[in-house]
Every structure is written in C-alpha cells, then in structure tokens.
C-alpha cells in the first residue's frame, strides 16, 4: 500500500475557516480530495487547499472532482499529474532496444505515444524522423492515385507500401484538404505498379461516403499525400518505436548510448470535473500543475475520420437532391460528430479556473470545457506537445444533432458562457491530428480570448463558432483580442490565423496580429490560406484593427451585418507591440 502523508495546518484552533493539506508523490490525490471533503463536511474548514509537492503523481484512474468538492484549491510546486506508466527492463536486440509492456490495472494495454527522456518519440512511419537540412520530412510523402467509392478501395503507388503489404496493424494517415484521417489497413493487393488498399470498419464506410473533406486525386487537383505508420517494418531510424500488441513488446531504436527514461500513456483523461445543471461544481482553482501523458485510443480501435477541428464523424453521407435551407445555401451532406478526449474535462461547472498550469505530452486534447460551463479562467498556462486541440470550449453539435442544424437549446445552461483564456502560450500543439486548432471554441457565448501567443501549429490558430448556418443560435458577445499568431498552417490549408463560423451577434475580433504562414508544398490548394477568414454563416461579427502583412482575407457564404474596419498592414505599431502573451 502506498504511504500517505497528510500535514494539515488549520487556520485557528476553534472555529477553523481554512485548511491546508500537503501531499507528496507517493500519496493519493483521490485520498487528499476526500480528506478535504471531510474537513468541509464536518465543519472544520470552509476553504481547503491541497499542496502538491514536486514530483510526478502517477494515476491509475482519473481524478474526479464533484459538486461536493466546490471551493477546493490545488496548488502544485513542480508537480506533474501523469496518466503514464514507466517502461523498464530494456534489452538490446541488434540496433533496437526491446522491453516487455506490463499490464495496467490487470489488463494488457495499447498506446499511440511514447515519451523518451521527456521528448515524444516517433511512432514508426514511412517518412523520415528528420532531415539534415532541417526541412519538413513530410515533403517526402507519397500521393494517392485514385479511389473507388463504391467498393471502398484506395489506389496508391506500389513503391509507397511495399514494406507493409503484410503488416497486421499498419495505418494510413491521409491528408484531405483541411483534415487528416487515420485509417487502419485491412488489405493490400498489388496490380502492376499500383496497390489497392482496403480499410477496416467502421472507418472504411465513413471514409468513402463522407463528401467533405474528401481526398484529392490527379483529376481533382493536387493528389492527396499520405504516410504509413504502426508497422515494425517501418522501424528504421533512431528515435522511432513500435508496440507489438500481440507479443506485448515495445521496440525502440535509440540514439547512440541513449539512457532511457521511457513513459507510455495508459489514461485518456487525467481530471474530470463534473456536476449537474442544478448542482454545478463551483469555485475550484488549480495552480501551477502540469498535466502530462495521456493517449486517445479511438483511432486504433475504430479509425478517425474528422469533419473539422478534429471532431470525428460517427455517420456521414452525401445528399441527393440537396436540401434547401432558408437564408442559407443548399446543403449537400449530412454528418454527426463526436469529440476526442482531453487531459482535463469539465461539465456543469461554475468558475473553475486554471492558473500557471502546463498541458504537455498529451495524446488527445489539452483542456476542454465541454458542456454547461459558466465562466472559468485559463491564465498564464502553457500548451505544448499536444496531439490534438489545445484549449477547447463549448458544444460542436450534440451527438444526436446533425451538425449543420442550428443549436439553440431550450435550457441555456447547456451553453458554455463567459470563459476567459488569456496570457497563454500555445506551440507544437496539433502535432498528430493536423486538422486541429490551438484554441477551438464552438457554440459559446461571451468567451474572451485575449493576449495569447500561438505559433508552430499545423492548421488554424483560433477557431470561433460552429454550424455552417446563419440562423440565430446560442452564440453571442464573443471577444478575440490582441492575440499573436504566427508560423501556422504548417501542414493544412483552407485555414486562417483566426477563423469563424455562424451567427454571433456582438462578437468583436480586434487588435490581433497574424503573420508568417507556413508554405508546405503538399497542401490541396497552395493559394487557399488566409490571415482572417469568416466562413459559412458568419454574421454580426466585427473585424477591426487587426494587423496582417496584407489583406489576404476570405468571406465565404457569410450572413448579414459583418463589419470590416481598418485591418491590414496599415494598423499602428502600438497594436503590434501589445499583441500576444504579456
């Protein structure tokens, strides 16, 4: 049994109002939270702070905070809350190191990430880990030849897949305009210089029936690039790894004389803050804590075919004839969505705040205000080495609602309102799902996104709104102010530094600086990028005083009453100097 140490310092001897609980990494976070509950329940304290001393707190299940924990503060002193497990017992096998993967909580595990000495290693893949000149190794991706929608077959050059023709668990990562799909390969059949690839279900049906985004072929534009991963046959460079789930072995090709501290993720979520509509979780603050080492296993189990911003399709198909929508253009497709897990997830909360935290080494998203969250600040936090979205807020259509339909819940408490994300630093997020976003806000009201610095990301910097629809919905009074965004769109286009969807009365996007877009050669349309982009249904939005190197903007199928005022290179230096993290 783990040793549990609690040192409780009480504010006064008789009627105590505050208490402090001090724990160490060999203590239980869950037990500390329970102790805080009991102090409050027994009337011994009204405010409790749990102090996490330095070190790594390995979890075997998510830490759950409920309405009974309202008023709690967690303070970290170089503390890491980890969903990982250390791998030890490495043995040399030629150029590789191999270790047994132990069970976790009594069962075998699988994972999609590995961190070695604090750095994400590369899951064995068909493109180089890096190139001597520092250029983008993904420039060496192969391109598809064509695809057969009816029979669910994708054709590729034989040279591209020759190594993995018989690999049992290989995956294709397919670049599709503004998304990437993860497709588990079922079969490879050679015919001359080409190979016909089929995929496992359920993603095979989704991949060939969803119309947007679709892969490009030589007949439709720049053919879609792809790379292969998760096959031992691809493990050929230092820094790469492969997990043999049949044999429960982990293979890693090390740097010369590299001494390993290796961690694999075993949890998908670290902290769940969950209340109810009548009894939300209130007034919780988490300070100075690092959240690390999660995975997200759905792509390994069911594939991953997203519509946009990493929101994955559960069903999708093309409409014939198209649907007439009053005040909107005709609709040619249907889609229902799910969302990836995040390291920290919130539902039915009020004033749950994060100050000076780090979200890093994560295989899903970072921080997600999912449903019915009121207020809540995220300040002076760092988001880095995240596979998917960094900060996420609001609904992206409930699972049962077709995603192009307007979302206007009868109970407005469902809507995330009044969040404030400021003075945060986002970089090297979206590093696995390239179609994800640093700050991704869907159906939100009164969100304030200001003075953040965002750079080195795969796609769009800030995405605000959802729905592809100009009908009046629950979005309003949002603010995007004085953010600095650069080196974005490193892998995907049809993007912008700041991007909007839908009708958002009272929304103002002002005094932001957007510059320095990346120029990958493999995007579907090399001209389809923008600094500012109001997409379908965007209405009642004010864009003013934003500095960009040129007026490369797009207004696509917008609704009424958008205002564009004083945006471009003429905006004053004082605005440029004030943008970003302070």
Give the ranges of each region predicted by the language model.
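Extracellular polysaccharide-degrading/modifying enzymes targeting complex plant/algal/animal polysaccharides
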Residues: 22-348, 353, 399-410
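The right-handed parallel beta-helix/beta-solenoid scaffold, focusing on the short coil/turn
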Residues: 46-48, 55, 61, 70-72, ...
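Sec-dependent N-terminal signal peptides
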Residues: 4-13
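Boundary at the C-terminal end of the N-terminal hydrophobic targeting segment
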Residues: 16-19
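Right-handed parallel beta-helix
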Residues: 282-293, 330, 350-361, 373-388, ...
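Short glycine/acidic-rich loop motifs that flank beta-strands on beta-rich extracellular proteins
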Residues: 61-62, 268, 295-301, 341, ...
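Extracellular beta-rich repeat passengers
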Residues: 127-128, 140, 297, 522-582
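Extracellular beta-strand solenoid repeats
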Residues: 51, 58, 64, 73-75, ...
């Amino acid at each position: 049994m783990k040793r549990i140490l609690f040192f409780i310092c009480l504010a006064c001897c008789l009627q105590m109002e505050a208490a402090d609980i001090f724990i160490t990494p060999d203590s239980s976070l869950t037990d500390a939270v329970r102790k805080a509950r009991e102090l409050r329940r027994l009337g011994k304290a009204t405010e409790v702070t749990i102090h996490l001393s330095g070190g790594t707190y390995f979890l075997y299940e998510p830490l759950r905070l409920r309405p009974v924990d309202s008023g709690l503060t967690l303070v970290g002193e170089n503390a890491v809350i980890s969903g990982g497990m250390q791998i030890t017992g490495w043995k040399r096998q030629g150029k590789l190191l191999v270790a047994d993967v132990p069970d976790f909580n009594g069962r075998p595990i699988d994972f999609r990430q590995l961190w070695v000495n604090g750095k994400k290693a590369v899951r064995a893949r068909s493109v180089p880990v890096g190139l001597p000149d520092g250029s983008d190794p993904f420039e060496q991706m192969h391109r598809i030849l064509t695809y057969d929608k009816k029979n669910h077959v994708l054709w590729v050059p034989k040279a591209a897949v020759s190594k993995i023709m018989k690999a049992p668990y290989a995956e294709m990562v397919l670049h599709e305009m503004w998304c990437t799909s993860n497709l588990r390969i079922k079969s490879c059949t050679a015919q001359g210089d080409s190979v016909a690839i089929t995929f496992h279900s359920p993603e095979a049906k989704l991949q060939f029936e969803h119309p947007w985004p679709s892969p490009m072929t030589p007949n439709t534009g720049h053919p879609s690039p792809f790379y292969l991963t998760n096959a031992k046959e691809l493990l050929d460079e230092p820094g790469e790894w492969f997990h043999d789930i049949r044999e429960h072995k982990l293979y890693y090709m090390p740097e010369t004389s590299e001494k390993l501290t290796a961690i694999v993720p075993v949890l998908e979520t670290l902290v769940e803050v969950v209340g109810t509509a009548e009894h939300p979780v209130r007034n919780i603050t988490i300070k100075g804590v690092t959240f690390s080492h999660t995975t997200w296993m759905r792509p390994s189990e069911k594939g991953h075919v997203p519509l946009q911003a990493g929101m994955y399709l559960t069903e999708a198909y093309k409409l014939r004839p198209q649907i007439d929508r009053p005040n909107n253009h005709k609709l040619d497709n249907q889609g229902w969505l799910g969302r990836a897990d995040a390291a920290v997830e919130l539902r039915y909360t009020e004033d749950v705040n994060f100050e000076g935290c780090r979200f890093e080494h994560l295989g899903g998203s970072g921080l997600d205000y999912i449903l019915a969250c009121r207020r809540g600040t995220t300040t002076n936090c760092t988001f880095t080495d995240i596979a998917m979205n960094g900060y996420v807020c609001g609904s992206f259509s409930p699972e049962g609602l077709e995603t192009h339909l307007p979302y206007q819940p009868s109970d407005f408490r469902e809507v995330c309102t009044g969040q404030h994300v400021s003075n945060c630093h986002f970089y090297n997020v979206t590093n696995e799902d390239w179609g994800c976003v640093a700050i991704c806000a869907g159906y939100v009201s009164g969100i304030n996104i200001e003075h953040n610095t965002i750079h080195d990301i795969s796609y769009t910097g800030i995405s605000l709104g959802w729905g592809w629809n100009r009908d009046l919905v629950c979005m309003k009074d949002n603010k995007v102010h004085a953010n600095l965004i650069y080196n974005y769109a490193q892998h995907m286009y049809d993007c912008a530094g700041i991007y909007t969807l839908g009708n958002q009365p009272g929304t103002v996007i002002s005094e932001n600086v957007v510059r320095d877009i990346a120029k990958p050669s493999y995007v579907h349309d090399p001209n389809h990028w923008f600094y500012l982009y109001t997409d379908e249904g965007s209405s009642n939005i004010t864009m003013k005083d934003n500095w960009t190197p040129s007026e490369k903007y797009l207004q696509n199928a917008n609704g009424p009453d958008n205002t564009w005022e004083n945006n471009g290179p003429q905006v004053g230096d004082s605005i440029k100097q004030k943008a970003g993290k302070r």
